[in-house]
């Protein structure tokens, strides 16, 4: 199979997953969006890092998705790379997702948006008891990407997820709080 056929197949598979997810997103937007992005991130990671996709594959897939789904937003090459980063950042901390476990073998996104959310729990993490799946799923993808890009540890990521939700921070406020290093200064305010 040549690269063009592979990309056409990839576009078809991702397009089907996107359309399924968009239908259900009306009732649970963040949950569905994060599930879809995590699944696409997994698929892209397996194929671009471990598979045989060449340079430019993500750009080609993004362009083809835009052609086949006019008006589609959020699937630029940069955003697809962010999805891959989202998956790669969280995959070590979250349990394996059984509904997409064969993703690297059969190159399909079997019900990406039907990921079992209860299986999204940290593995062997001292913060396991502090992990709140509702908080994780309650935060939008843009907020997650700000946290991923600007923090260094799971503990720090979880702190900013909880704070962003509790305080209803906009993405600008979240970025400012991270820049202010609120995580490392949180005890200082109480001690002053």
What are these regions (language model features)?
Residues 1-192:
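Basic, low-complexity intrinsically disordered segments
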């Amino acid at each position: 199979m040549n690269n063009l056929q592979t990309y056409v197949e990839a576009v078809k598979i991702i397009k089907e997953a996107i359309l399924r997810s968009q239908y259900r997103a009306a009732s649970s937007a963040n949950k569905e969006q994060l599930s879809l992005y995590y699944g696409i991130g997994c698929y892209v990671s397996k194929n671009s890092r471990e598979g045989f996709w060449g340079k430019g594959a993500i750009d080609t897939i993004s362009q083809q998705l835009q052609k086949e789904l006019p008006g589609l937003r959020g699937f630029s090459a940069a955003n697809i790379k962010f999805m891959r980063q989202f998956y790669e950042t969280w995959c070590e901390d979250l349990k394996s997702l059984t509904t997409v476990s064969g993703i690297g073998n059969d190159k399909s996104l079997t019900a990406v948006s039907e990921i079992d959310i209860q299986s999204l729990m940290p593995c062997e993490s001292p913060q396991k008891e502090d992990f709140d799946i509702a908080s994780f799923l309650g935060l939008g993808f843009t907020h997650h990407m700000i946290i991923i890009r600007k923090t260094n540890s799971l503990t720090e990521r979880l702190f900013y997820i909880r704070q962003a939700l509790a305080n209803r921070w906009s993405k600008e406020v979240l970025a400012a709080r991270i820049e202010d290093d609120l995580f490392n200064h949180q005890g200082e305010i109480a001690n002053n």
